[in-house]
């Protein structure tokens, strides 16, 4: 099962143009929102998380209860978390495309002498970056989107394409939750099949 789990914040640029903030350097454009982090943990725990190198490098450390697979150029040094942790497995973009489109792949670890099989029975959460999410959407069984709204402008260095969210909205929404975080922040988590 392939599940997309991500969040974004609709905002405006300094020039007044709409944008969908996704990342800010090696962090989150909206800062730490406790409920968002709790929801993310609940949606990804017990799954194999697949992410790009920059997403992995933005993590403080390996997240407990989840395996980490990083899509990267294997000819370069392996990306690590802020604490210097290696991922459980590293794969190429080609292996990622093979997997999400229905194939099986062998994944190997820099820490272990064995290989393991990743197949369609594996519970996988794709968490970003945008290119990985865009590529996986046509094959995703479930999409979990968190929309974080701030009353003020949110700075970002990585944005989502609006057409990506339009494609998600064409799916059936099966669940939605709204949370008032504080006077300037709301969070809406929606699940699509």
UniProtKB/Swiss-Prot annotation:
Residues 1-193 form the DHFR domain. It comes from the Viruses. GO terms for molecular function: dihydrofolate reductase activity. Its EC number is 1.5.1.3. PROSITE patterns: DHFR_1, DHFR_2. It is an enzyme of class 1 (oxidoreductase). Keywords: Antibiotic resistance, Methotrexate resistance, NADP, One-carbon metabolism, Oxidoreductase, Trimethoprim resistance. Belongs to the dihydrofolate reductase family. Key enzyme in folate metabolism. Catalyzes an essential reaction for de novo glycine and purine synthesis, and for DNA precursor synthesis. This is Dihydrofolate reductase. It comes from Enterobacteria phage T4 (Bacteriophage T4).
């Amino acid at each position: 099962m392939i599940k997309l789990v991500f969040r974004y914040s609709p905002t405006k640029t300094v020039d007044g143009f709409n944008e969908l903030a996704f990342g800010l350097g090696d962090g989150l454009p909206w800062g730490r929102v406790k409920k968002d982090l709790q929801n993310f943990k609940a949606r990804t725990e017990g799954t194999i998380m697949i992410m790009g190198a920059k997403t992995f490098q933005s993590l403080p450390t390996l997240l407990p209860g989840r395996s980490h697979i990083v899509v990267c150029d294997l000819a370069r040094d392996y990306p690590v978390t802020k604490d210097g942790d290696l991922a459980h497995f590293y794969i190429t973009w080609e292996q990622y495309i093979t997997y999400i489109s229905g194939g099986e792949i062998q994944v190997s670890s820099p820490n272990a002498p064995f290989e393991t099989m990743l197949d369609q029975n594996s519970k996988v959460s794709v968490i970003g970056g945008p290119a990985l999410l865009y590529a996986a959407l046509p094959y995703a069984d479930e999409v979990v989107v968190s929309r974080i709204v701030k009353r003020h402008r949110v700075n970002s260095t990585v944005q989502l394409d609006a057409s990506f969210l339009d494609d998600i909205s064409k799916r059936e929404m099966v669940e939605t939750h709204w949370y008032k975080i504080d006077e300037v922040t709301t969070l809406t988590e929606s699940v699509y099949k």
